[in-house]
């Protein structure tokens, strides 16, 4: 199995074979300039080189995500069910009141984005941020992927590898699940 670095090197070689692919880079930038990937009234910066992960790394991300979700769900369940446990958290009483309101859906944590640093040498991870309030990053990822998906280097790479994006899970899949909650 190629390493993530080897996949990236292969992709960069495809770009180099096309003399840097100025036309593809300009098309990607034009896509971004007309996209919905905007943060603080500015189009987000993006790289023309996608972040490529092999199967091992994808499986590691899956394990980290599922384990983290399980732990967070257990903590949230304990918080909701055990009043003595709540003192561990210094939360404004008004917010506690809102937290304890009935949800109207089963999931304790219907949405989260967990940011981490992954050491690709040993697959260890360090968390740097937890978010459960929304994520413009899902839309940014979708737009950035769309900006390069029709480029010649990307098409050549995809022809040689099984390429899978996470757009369905990150954006459309989330929208579908969100609508099911309130259907």
Residue ranges and their predicted role:
Residues 1-183:
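Preference for protein termini
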């Amino acid at each position: 199995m190629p390493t993530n670095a080897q996949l990236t090197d292969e992709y960069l070689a495809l770009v180099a074979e096309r003399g840097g692919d100025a036309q593809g880079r300009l098309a990607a930038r034009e896509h971004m300039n007309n996209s919905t990937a905007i943060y603080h009234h500015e189009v987000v910066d993006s790289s023309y080189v996608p972040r490529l992960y092999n199967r091992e790394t994808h499986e590691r991300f899956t394990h980290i995500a599922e384990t983290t979700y399980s732990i967070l769900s257990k903590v949230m369940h304990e918080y909701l069910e055990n009043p003595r446990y709540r003192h561990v958290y210094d939360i404004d009483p008004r917010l506690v009141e809102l937290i304890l309101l009935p949800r109207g859906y089963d999931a304790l944590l219907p949405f989260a984005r967990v940011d981490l640093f992954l050491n690709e040498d040993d697959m260890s991870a360090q968390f740097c941020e937890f978010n459960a309030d929304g994520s413009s990053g899902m839309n940014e990822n979708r737009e950035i992927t769309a900006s390069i998906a029709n480029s010649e280097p990307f098409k050549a790479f995809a022809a040689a590898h099984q390429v899978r994006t996470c757009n369905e899970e990150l954006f459309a899949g989330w929208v579908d699940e969100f609508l099911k909650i309130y259907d």
